[in-house]
Structures are given as C-alpha cells and as structure tokens.
C-alpha cells in the first residue's frame, strides 16, 4: 500500500509542476517604459544578457530575476535565454571580469511585481497565474 501511495503522491507533484510550466510567463515592464510591444524573445534575451542597456527613449533598462532555484526562473532561462543554469552562471562569471553584474534578484513573483511597479525602466517576468496589476505586459511566453 505504501509504495502505491508514494507513486500517487509523486504523480501529483509532477502534474502540479507540469501545470506551473504550462502556464507560461508574462514579461512585464514598469508603466513608464515606452516600447513597441510585443517584445521578441531575442530582444528580451538581449536585455537579460545585458546586450541592450537602454530603452528606445534612452532611459536605463533595469532587469529583475527570480532566485536561481525558482521554477519560474528555470522556465525563463530555458525558454527565453535558451541556456541552462550552469551555462548562465559561466556567462555571468565572464561578464563579472568586465565589471558587469547580473540582474537584481527578487525572492517571489509578488516581489518581482512590486519591484517592476516601483522602479522606472524595470523589466521582469511572472507566471501567467499572477495578475499584472500596475505594470505593462510587453510579451507573453507560452
């Protein structure tokens, strides 16, 4: 009986994890950002890899990430940046020697949302299950 119960619990966890991935992501920006939407995945990747540092109006882009252990960040890294966490860490190590720092990290989707609401020029990502209140949705990632 115990192995069967364990199998059922494991299946439920996998289904829930899969549904979180299936939700997709919203790429959100501070309401002050004036940019043609939707942004392409290439543009978003360039922002997060610090290849684009300013918005079209000349204001600074301030990208914000989830913590490295977040499922939302894993989905973003694999889907948008097309890298795994190890490759991305190696990329940031290289840029560190050029004096560049990775994006700011927030511990929850609500914290990302609050950061983007309050920091001019900021851009972040949240799952589609979070209401994007007070921000501009600049792209949707399936």
Locations of regions flagged by a protein language model:
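Bacterial N-terminal signal peptides that target proteins for export
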Residues: 1-8
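Cleavable N-terminal signal peptides
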Residues: 9-10, 20
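Sec/Tat signal peptide C-region and signal peptidase I cleavage site
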Residues: 16-22
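Exported/periplasmic ABC-transporter solute-binding proteins
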Residues: 23-142
